[in-house]
């Protein structure tokens, strides 16, 4: 995998800039994280202090290894839209070790294809620059919006890979997750 490779921390798509986190991202990230619709399939809804601490951990990971959950900025407006990127999950998942792709966008940006656009660029970095052989994604069973993004990215559901997420309490409606996978495209 990509321990010593330092890809560019910032890269662009036609409408987005994926970059290192800045202090100006903290307030809009906290607002995104406090939105019950955004957090519908995630636990728990964080406090402002929790949100700031998460942003600091993400920023430190990018600073240390060159990649992670990049802040997503809308190029035309300059606004923070959310985050997208790659991560090695800390939880002991049944399919670990792995690299996951994930995203979270403010509701203002939903329905415009931005999550797919940003995630497609992150996958490209993961495969072409970092050399990962496979990237996974997972979500609670009921999160059909994220599952649809995974499918638009060309990811396929691992029908034998459904699992109970260890960070979600037993008996909670969000505990059961579906698993998607995508392999590095083969050339020629």
Q: What role is predicted for each listed range?
A:
Residues 1-41, 73-188:
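Acyl-donor (CoA/ACP) binding surface of acyl/acetyltransferases
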Residues 37-59, 68-70:
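Conserved GNAT-fold acetyl-CoA-binding loop/helix
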Residues 66-68, 85:
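Glycine-centered flexibility motif
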């Amino acid at each position: 995998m990509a321990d010593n490779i330092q890809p560019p921390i910032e890269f662009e798509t036609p409408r987005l800039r994926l970059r290192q986190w800045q202090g100006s991202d903290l307030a809009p990230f906290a607002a995104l994280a406090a939105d019950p619709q955004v957090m519908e399939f995630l636990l728990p809804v964080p406090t402002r202090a929790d949100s700031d601490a998460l942003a600091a951990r993400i920023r430190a990971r990018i600073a240390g290894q060159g990649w992670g959950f990049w802040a997503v900025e809308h190029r035309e407006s300059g606004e923070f839209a959310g985050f997208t990127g790659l991560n090695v999950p800390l939880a002991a998942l049944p399919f670990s070790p792995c690299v996951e792709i994930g995203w979270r966008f403010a509701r203002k940006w939903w329905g415009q294809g931005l999550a797919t656009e940003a995630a497609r660029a992150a996958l490209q970095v993961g495969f072409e620059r970092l050399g990962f052989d496979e990237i996974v994604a997972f979500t609670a069973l009921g999160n059909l919006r994220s599952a649809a993004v995974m499918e638009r990215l060309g990811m396929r559901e691992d029908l034998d890979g459904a699992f109970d997420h260890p960070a979600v309490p037993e008996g909670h409606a969000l505990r059961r997750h579906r698993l998607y996978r995508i392999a590095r495209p083969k050339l020629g």
